[in-house]
Design a protein with these regions (language model features):
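The feature captures the beta-strand-to-loop junction immediately N-terminal to the Walker
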Residues: 37-39
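Conserved ABC ATPase "signature" region
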Residues: 67-68, 116-134
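Helix-to-loop junction immediately C-terminal to a conserved catalytic motif
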Residues: 52
Length: 255
């Protein structure tokens, strides 16, 4: 078996006396799409921020390609960050920058690229995520919700990462736009051979895109294939995957 792209070992996160994660272990395998789910307050975003190196845990390790990012300096961490792309729940595009300028920002941070190269890379990324080329000169305020998600994805792909983090990628989208974004993620995952870590509450997205699922529950984590996790006896997992909304989602994916 290939070495994990990410290994989380004995992770502890707490805020004051509130323990969010208590000894969490998680491996992200090369080439998979791993979905992370959990109820409110289980620390999905905290786990993501810790894996991104944006938050230092109270204990444990986060190894990316064998290197523990929890003990890195900011300079060392910067070299790791160029290897992954990330989209946040609401896009997090800079409102005063055009779509092109947002996409070019990480490239400018790491490389001294010519304007011609920047424009060519911008056009390529726009095509990759299915945005029209005239979107390049628009501000985020001029875009629809679905276009903002795609522009954020284009920026996340700017440095050709092998690892992609998606935080609630379909949140706020109508069902048609969400299904279209799911298909885009599958297409990019296959075509670019990406490893994807996705936080989502959207069962349709989970069922349509993920190979494995990690459930944050009781300060721990349960990880399995979709089929395996759906048979887990924990009451929250059973309600999540077999409640009325879950049955409707499974029926829509099967049809």
């Amino acid at each position: 078996m290939s070495e994990p792209v990410i290994s989380v070992r004995g992770l502890v996160n707490r805020f004051g006396t509130q323990v969010v994660h208590d000894g969490v272990d998680l491996d992200v395998l090369p080439g998979e799409v791993l979905g992370i789910v959990g109820g409110s307050g289980t620390g999905k975003s905290v786990l993501l921020r810790t894996m991104l190196g944006l938050q230092r845990p109270a204990g444990g390790q986060v190894l990316i390609e064998g290197r523990d990012i929890t003990r890195m300096s900011q300079v060392e961490l910067l070299s790791v960050k160029r290897r992954y792309g990330v989209t946040f729940q609401h896009g997090a595009l800079f409102s005063s920058l055009t779509v092109a300028e947002n996409i070019q920002l990480p490239i400018r941070e790491y490389f001294d690229a010519s304007e011609q190269t920047l424009n060519a890379l911008t056009e390529l990324r726009l095509r990759m995520v299915g945005l029209p080329l005239d979107a390049a000169d628009k501000l985020p305020s001029q875009l629809s919700g679905g276009m903002i998600k795609r522009a954020a994805l284009a920026r996340a792909l700017a440095l050709d990462p092998g690892l992609l983090f998606l935080d609630e990628p379909t949140a706020g989208l109508d069902p048609i736009s969400a299904a279209s974004f799911d298909e885009l993620v599958r297409y990019l995952h296959r075509g670019l051979k990406l490893t994807v870590v996705m936080i989502t509450h959207d069962l349709d997205t989970l069922l349509a895109t993920c190979n494995r699922v990690a459930v944050l529950i009781d300060q721990k984590i349960v990880v399995d294939t979709l089929a395996g996790i759906m048979n887990h006896p924990h009451p929250w997992i059973q309600e999540y995957f077999h409640g009325p909304r879950a049955r409707a989602a499974q029926a829509s994916v099967s049809s």
